Amino acid sequence: MQGSTDSQSRISSVLPGAASCRNQCFTYYIKGTERTVNHLCLSSILIREGLLIMENTRFAGILGTGHYAPEKILTNADLEKMVDTSDEWIRTRTGIETRHIAAQSENTSDLCVHAAKQAMEAAGVTADDIDFILVATASPDYVVPSTACLVQDKLGCTHAGAMDISAGCSGYIYAVAVASNMVKAGMYKHILVIGAEILSRLVNWHDRSTCILFGDGAGAAVIGETEEGYGLLASDLGSDGSLGKILDIPASGVAEPVTHRAIDSGRIYIHMEGPEVFKAAVRHMGATTLKTLEKAGVEKDDIDMFIAHQANNRIIQAIAKRLQVPADHMWVNVDRFGNTSAASVGIALDEAVRAGKVKHGDIVVLTGFGAGLTWGCDVMRWM
């Protein structure tokens, strides 16, 4: 640490008690409120306040966002004609009214490209500036090659590395964390992150428990270096493979290949044990968010924009209630998009940004939960 003596006096003046640690806890003040944190959080607070400067420290975060939704819209009224359901039943239980459905001519990589171009334009970068591409998806164009490689070709990012991330609905959260830390480590300057899905081809349109939920779309972001103290402040990624069977596609790989029997029995489609998924989602999204806020040295009251995975409205509201996030500090679009899995947080974030709801210096919290089971949270100070 540079200028340790001078920094010590500055720390003491701004963070009373930080100079004399007792029981590995520090007391500091923000907006006139006394707060106490453990020693693991102190570095995040000092960096954020501009009091701690490490040699070769890089800061990284989102420079621009974009999203894309296919033109076709499927309404609840349309679904009433397909399965035994009703608009009232769907809205009451999920909050969903419409969802976008990809055309037969569109693949996941195509949705990625549309969203990526928006994000690159917003970030002021070109295809030549992109050093690496991360695509989070559960509905890739192929098993191999990766969807990220197809996107690399379609965008003309000729010197970029590329790979897919398979973390279900948590994929965008995972990708933002991985990309930000790759930039912080000095590996790359600009990384394109995309969460994209065409789940309409993976649901059984005769199963009303799943076909009413999912939609297609893509959300993208360009990750790069930010000003000191801005960008990703902290992240947390978790998983529990022992519960993987409550949300899966049984016949989708070498453990259970696609056969005529698997097709006839419906095992090639999304299978979900709704009540168990609901309980796990609320528990883990709440816990990972609180853990990440602590890592970042940020209180719940400091949150300016909270975006949770848009699974269904009941889950979103349960998370918000647990975290005591007011409605005007949230962005919810599940009513218009349905559950777009890895795309949902990216789509919601871009909408919030373009609506002017996310401003320079705002604390933005992204949290998600998905198949795996996986979960995660990113806390950032917006550029």
What spans do the regions from the language model cover?
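Condensing-enzyme catalytic core mediating Claisen C-C bond formation in acyl metabolism
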Residues: I53-Q104, D207-K279, R283, A287, ...
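Catalytic phosphate/nucleotide-handling subdomain of diverse soluble enzymes
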Residues: I347-T367, L373, V379-M383
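Phosphate/pyrophosphate-binding loops at sites that engage ATP/ADP/AMP, CoA/4′-phosphopantetheine
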Residues: A115-D131, T288-D302, A352-K357
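Short, Lys/Arg-enriched N-terminal segments with co-localized hydrophobic residues
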Residues: K31-I53
